Amino acid sequence: MDYRGLTLDPFQEEAVEYIEDGHSVLVAAPTGTGKTLIADYLIEHILDDGGEVIYTAPVKALSNQKYREYTALFGRDKVGLVTGDLVINRDAPVRIMTTEILRNMLLEGGHGGVMEDVEPDEAPDEAELSDIEQTASPSDSHLPEIERLQAVIIDEIHFLDDPSRGTVWEELLIYLPTRIRILGLSATASNLEEVASWLTEIRETDVKVVRENERAVPLKIYMASLETGIVPVKKFNNLYKGGRGRGNGGKSTRHYHLFDMMQDWRFPALYFIFSRKLVEKLARGLARGDVGRKLSKMADTQAINEHLNAFEEEYPEVLSPRDKATLRKGIGWHHAGIHVALKALVEELYEARLLNVLYCTSTFALGINMPARTVVFDGLTKYNGVDVVPLTVREFMQMAGRAGRRGIDEVGDVIVRQDFDDYDEVQPLLGRLIAEESEPIESSFNLTFHSVVNLVARFDEEEIRSMLERSFRAFQARTEAERLGERIEDKRAENAAVEQQPEEALGPEAMQERRRSRRKLAALERELAERRRPRLWEDFQRKLQFLRTYDYLTAHNELEPPARILRHIKIEEIFLTELILAGHLEDLTPTELFGAMCGLVVSLPRRAKVRRPDDDKWWEVFANFEAVYESEVVVRAEDLVDSETVFTPEVMPLGERWARGDQLNDILDDIRNPTDMSGDLVGCFRRAKDMIGQLRDVYYSDAARRKELTRLIHRVSRDEVEVLD
């Protein structure tokens, strides 16, 4: 079968046939094999039918990338973008949005709290106010946004098990009307059939699974050290077993050694390292050494300069002389903290094949399609904020899968920097990585207080209990309980023959074995009872009791004023609601309010130091906010949702400066940090803008306040914050 002049691979053809037959489909295929072509086909199929489709992505950068791709493919009038930052053509038949936006739309009704594109001096009309008031049920197919919706494409569907965001994925799949088809895409998931069985059960229609295990460009994994050079894993193992170099106190292998060993044909290369500071440091260090001179000879300096000159016309203060010298040698760096415009420049240079080495963190591998000839890992462990932990197979393959460019390379090389000193610790992990023994998707379902109040606003407790029973977490618990029940039956049958014999007929060893069997059976029965506990319902009841205790709900689950506020708050839910109730936002000017929200959305790196504010007013704000932050209600809420409340007061004056119109570089002068933090600050301003949008919904009945907040949103939506990155 051909599509767009391409002969489809068998797995693509299988998925397309299921789509044509009207099925929902889950597709698991390695990075670079063409999963997105299936999504393109579905979109085209639905457009031809006069319907609508939503494409959800886990991150805004990927949403923005898909928007650019689909406007080029289907035309600007056919494609819309809806994220927390931007709303473009929201009524288009093809809409790209983050997963959270669609979930909010289904849970809350209306636009899910997304800002309309209104002019700063435009007051909200009655229709706009009524959008906020809608109370349609999550499964109500008559929401205006989904009346003609035929399908939802969920990219990176394995995010179901993400600890911080997986609940949103589950809620979306539970609330989505069953008439709407699903296309789920994943690079790797060992139990996708289990996910399909769950969806088949709750959606009452057969959900198909399509798998592709072969890579379009096969991977070859190498180990590299000064003593061995770049060698296949098997040879590295043999050298290690032979004792070569082990424990001899040899010189450690550095990043530049690897590039010195690499032949020209192995470039371009992505170098993954899990530290922002080292991403920048290593890139600049490589440019200064002998390897930098080698790479400089390979670089197209003239073409790079053309890009740099165009960039500097628009952003004259972003690049330092050292930055430009590094980029001119075809060496780049990329992480979430760098200036958004610089990030876009680096991606532009890389796509134009003008960078031969790109140092990056794992965020570069998430969804964005930028393959390389070679992928290099600085190591196979990373710091997760608490401990140094091994990479999961899924994380490793997400990054390793960038090696090998389809249609250009016959093979993609994956090189791991590894000395003999700690190879004992790495070997078991390496075996799992090479075998691609991907971890199963495990539910991380955990309702927020925002979800709880929105559910009780429109459902009784039995309906909510039924909804919780439809979650993937409940499905997995039931499945495990069934398996355990079968084991118990087998154990009982196994014990039966021995149990029938009188004790006097048994010898000491047989008696001991019978006691062991009884204990084992009792343990299995206790485990089964534990598995059958309605944990989600118990958790829901605890949160419900919390909301009653602190007067958010009546004893009959009617919404009190705090809960009516909470229905619109999605970030730092209880903390922000309590700040509103305490009146601490009332006396703040709009610019101060924006600054205050910045303190609730970002945590600074440990080494970052922010200049103390000169204005005494901020010390009073800090004290007021801190009193709420340390209050019993906020502390107890934090325990119940098992996440830490964000409170970073030193960022507040920086946010106020942005709202006043100060330039990003001037604001950055007030922060001392070893790495570029402009990207962090821009991300902070964007999330604070989201919070202002939520406050705007809270004040739906106060036209003057809403108008003021709308103006504030337009004021902060400028320059870097408005960049479509």
Give the positions of each predicted feature.
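Conserved C-terminal RecA-like helicase domain
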Residues: 56, 64, 71-80, 276-357, ...
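Motif I (Walker A/P-loop) of helicase-class P-loop NTPases
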Residues: 35-44, 165-170
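Conserved pre-motif I regulatory segment
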Residues: 1-28
